[in-house]
């Protein structure tokens, strides 16, 4: 509130019937918003004044229009660039810059220049010796506040050329109200016990409640973008008839993480520079013994139609505990459970979304801890075609319809495919996941029937989240440098379901 300004407004109204806030701003040499703010303060004290909203429309220069006032119109600038001997049109366009095309067209229509085709190459020549820059002169009148004097045709043309813009200004016409006074009486904000006891409240004026005020935003928790995207992925899996797998085993044995997946014990992914091994407890001891023996055999000497890897499989390696490197370890446990359930095998569709851990170098796109999204389908006679069809359906629900597949190698799937999608924003194909058909060497030792195949695919949760929220550096999504304002103000996640 501006105490002196409010009283000046009231004193002025005492001498006149009506006053526009725009006129008051000019009269008092104050910003119009300050006048409006003082008006609201006056209105808070009761019906001292009445205010009628009025709308004013006026013409103003755009940035391009101001440049024309300062430097000249596009057509005049093009005319000035044409020397007496003429100039090639391409050279003229290059010299004229971004507005040369418009300037050339207007200069031609005004009859200021012509294209001389009697020479090779054709030259642009001046057609008149002098010109009058009418556009500049008319825009100068607008700059002086005389835009209402322009003919309607010119106004429409200048708007089309984005030299002028129409601005709408709201003001208030003030008049004396039924409680008019030239001074403001202090309004009470609280009704006290003393006021009620001595009856003083009846003589005082109280400030009215503002029921339109937004108030202070409540302090509350906010969902991280990863959780928002995770919810969308989970809903898509549930819509497709999948069941969620329990993923609470962050610490896993090498047996379930590697050996059960037919990944040899000499595989480089099992080295310490790729995997976080656990010291306490360092080993696991409880395994299904008959299943463990079948896994040992298929690794060492083969079986189920396979030659195996032909190496000395060691229990000590399988016992080592680690932070799981993929949620496929969870899938292995679920498939073993499915193979040995009462009543025999039944077709199943599973999914999981949870954390995995890799001993990787941290950079803008890689973390040592991230989320893996995995889908698994077990049924009789599944083929690579079923996998491709399922992937098209899954990614269609994500709003991705352009997919390509590239052959790849995984120890536990054959055939295997990398999944690529076309990113319109980046205008290129990007890798979004991996997929394949689980090998018989992995499935048959579990006890699954020979005619049962399992198809699976996986992708990270971080990459689609970064794409969805326009984040380029993963450190801006996870870690100590995350802007909490981004978490608080981030929109809900609605993937473009096709």
UniProtKB/Swiss-Prot annotation:
Residue sites binding Mg(2+) per the record: 414
Top EC class, one word: ligase
Listed SUPFAM superfamilies: Class II aaRS and biotin synthetases
Any one GO MF annotation of this record: magnesium ion binding
Name the record gives this protein: Phenylalanine--tRNA ligase alpha subunit
Chain sites annotated for binding L-phenylalanine: 328, 372-374, 412, 438
Names of the cofactor(s): Mg(2+)
Consequence of gene loss (knockout): Lethal when homozygous.
EC number, UniProt record: 6.1.1.20
Coiled coil: none
Similarity section: Belongs to the class-II aminoacyl-tRNA synthetase family. Phe-tRNA synthetase alpha subunit type 2 subfamily.
Record key words, sorted: Aminoacyl-tRNA synthetase, ATP-binding, Cytoplasm, Ligase, Magnesium, Metal-binding, Nucleotide-binding, Protein biosynthesis
Superkingdom: Eukaryota
Oligomer status and interactors: Tetramer of two alpha and two beta subunits.
Subcellular location: Cytoplasm
Reactions catalysed: tRNA(Phe) + L-phenylalanine + ATP = L-phenylalanyl-tRNA(Phe) + AMP + diphosphate + H(+)
Gene Ontology CC terms, in alphabetical order: cytoplasm; phenylalanine-tRNA ligase complex
Pfam families named in the record: PheRS_DBD1, PheRS_DBD2, PheRS_DBD3, tRNA-synt_2d
Gene: alpha-PheRS
């Amino acid at each position: 509130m501006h105490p002196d300004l409010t009283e000046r407004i009231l004193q002025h109204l005492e001498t006149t019937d009506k006053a526009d806030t725009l006129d008051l701003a000019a009269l008092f040499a104050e910003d119009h918003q300050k006048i409006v703010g003082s008006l609201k303060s006056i209105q808070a004290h009761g019906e001292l004044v009445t205010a009628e909203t009025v709308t004013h429309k006026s013409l103003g220069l755009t940035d391009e229009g101001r440049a024309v006032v300062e430097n000249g119109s596009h057509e005049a600038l093009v005319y000035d660039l044409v020397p007496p001997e003429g100039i090639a049109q391409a050279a003229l366009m290059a010299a004229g810059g971004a507005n040369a095309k418009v300037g050339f067209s207007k200069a031609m229509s005004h009859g200021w220049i012509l294209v001389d085709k009697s020479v090779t190459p054709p030259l642009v020549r001046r057609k008149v010796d002098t010109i009058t820059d009418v556009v500049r002169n008319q825009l100068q009148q607008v700059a002086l506040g005389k835009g209402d004097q322009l003919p309607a045709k010119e106004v429409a043309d200048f708007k089309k050329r984005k030299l002028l813009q129409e601005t709408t200004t709201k003001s208030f016409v003030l008049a004396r109200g039924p409680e008019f006074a030239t001074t403001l009486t202090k309004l009470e904000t609280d009704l006290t016990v003393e006021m009620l006891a001595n009856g003083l409240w009846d003589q005082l004026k109280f400030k009215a409640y503002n029921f339109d005020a937004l108030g202070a935003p409540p302090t509350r928790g906010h969902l991280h973008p990863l959780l928002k995207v995770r919810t969308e992925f989970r809903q898509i899996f549930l819509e497709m008839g999948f069941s969620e797998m329990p993923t609470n085993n962050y610490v896993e044995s090498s047996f379930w993480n590697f050996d059960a997946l037919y990944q040899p014990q000499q595989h480089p992914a099992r080295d310490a520079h790729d995997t976080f091994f656990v010291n306490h407890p360092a080993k696991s001891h409880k395994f299904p013994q008959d299943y463990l023996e079948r896994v040992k055999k298929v690794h060492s000497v083969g079986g189920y139609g396979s030659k195996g890897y032909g190496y000395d499989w060691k229990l000590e390696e399988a016992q080592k505990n680690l932070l799981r490197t993929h949620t496929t370890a969870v899938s292995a446990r679920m498939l073993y459970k499915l193979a040995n359930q009462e009543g025999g095998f039944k077709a199943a569709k599973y999914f999981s979304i949870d954390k995995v851990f890799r001993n990787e170098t941290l950079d803008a796109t890689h973390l040592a801890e991230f989320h893996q999204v995995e889908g698994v389908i077990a049924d009789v006679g599944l083929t690579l075609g079923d996998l491709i069809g399922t992937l098209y359906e899954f990614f269609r629900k994500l709003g991705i319809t352009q997919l390509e597949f590239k052959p790849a190698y995984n120890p536990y799937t054959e055939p295997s495919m990398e999944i690529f999608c076309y990113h319109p924003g980046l205008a290129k194909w990007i890798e979004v996941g991996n997929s394949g058909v689980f090998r018989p060497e992995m499935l048959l030792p579990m006890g699954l029937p020979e005619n049962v195949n399992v198809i699976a695919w996986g992708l990270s949760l971080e990459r689609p989240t970064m794409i969805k929220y326009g984040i380029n550096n993963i450190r801006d999504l996870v870690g100590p440098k995350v802007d909490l304002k981004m978490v608080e103000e981030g929109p809900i996640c609605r993937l473009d379901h096709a």
